[in-house]
Amino acid sequence: MRTMFVMLSILMLAVAQQNESLKYVQYDTDLIPQSVYKARRDSVMNMIGQDAVAVFYAGPERMRNADVDYIYRQADNFFYLTGFTEPNALLILVPKGITVKINDSTTQTVNEVLFVQNRNPLAESWTGRRYGTEGAMKLLGMQAALTNDKFKTTFMRTLFSGIKYLYAQPVTSDVTGELRELVQPIQSFVDNVKVHNSKIELRDPNAMVHTMRIVKSSEEITMLRKATEISVVAHNQAMMSVEPGMYEYELQGLYQYLFQRQGSEFYGYPCINGAGENSVILHYNTNRKKINNGDIVLSDCAAEYRDWARSKPS
């Protein structure tokens, strides 16, 4: 047993050393261009003005049970502005500019900074490679990307100096762990502003971004069409395949297979396959009943593609 543990430890170290030299790879070739995300961030800065700062944080990781997490999905607004898919990240938009030290050497005045998890070879041997600061700037087109530890030690001293408006998301109770540690200094500043009736006006940036998201760009429409096409193919195949004696979960499995076979990452929402009396339950997702001859089967399933989802009515 001890020998096996030692061998496993050596193997993990070898993998970690290999990962240290490997950079993040984008396997997908149809992603929305980084220029589109850049234009969105610029639009936000134009709307909030020179005397404001906007802060957005990534969606929290969620635990399924014990030490098993749900597959991570980025918060919609954060993804809309960055295209970044990793957890524990923070986006700062500063229209008037802020001076940062990139790669611990080059000093530069920028309007946007993305704080990300540091590269960690051992962690990456378990969960896959991370963007890191280099990947965030190169692949996402960020003006500056710094590791999360730099935020509290460097930026909180000067970030909010001289501003009139602070656009900051409320920190909700499901924000825990590393993300909570990252955003807590901002929440403490917000709480201080509320208590001392500061001259800084607090505003929620989500409403502004939601308004932007109402109007879809040509790139988004392409993604929506792709999601729709995937869903239509799956629905048509499911209608030809369903038969008495099948179970609702078999139909669900067929949808999942057909979605992912076409490149979809997730369902757009939990898949509903209700047969017989279950067909009138609006959000039924138990999907365990046997489908009998003469049953009406209602399927409400949609593919999500690059964070967009659309469906064809069944």
Question: Which positions does each model-derived feature cover?
Answer:
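Short catalytic-site patches enriched in acidic/histidine residues
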Residues: A66-Y72, Q187-D191, N206-M208, M246-S314
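Active-site pocket-lining segments that scaffold enzyme catalytic pockets across diverse folds
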Residues: K216-G263, Y269
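Short amphipathic alpha-helical leader/targeting segments
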Residues: G97, A238, G245, W308-A309
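A broad detector of the eukaryotic-type serine/threonine protein kinase catalytic domain
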Residues: H210, N236-M240, E277-N278
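A composition/biophysics-driven feature that prefers long, compositionally simple stretches
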Residues: R2, L11-V233
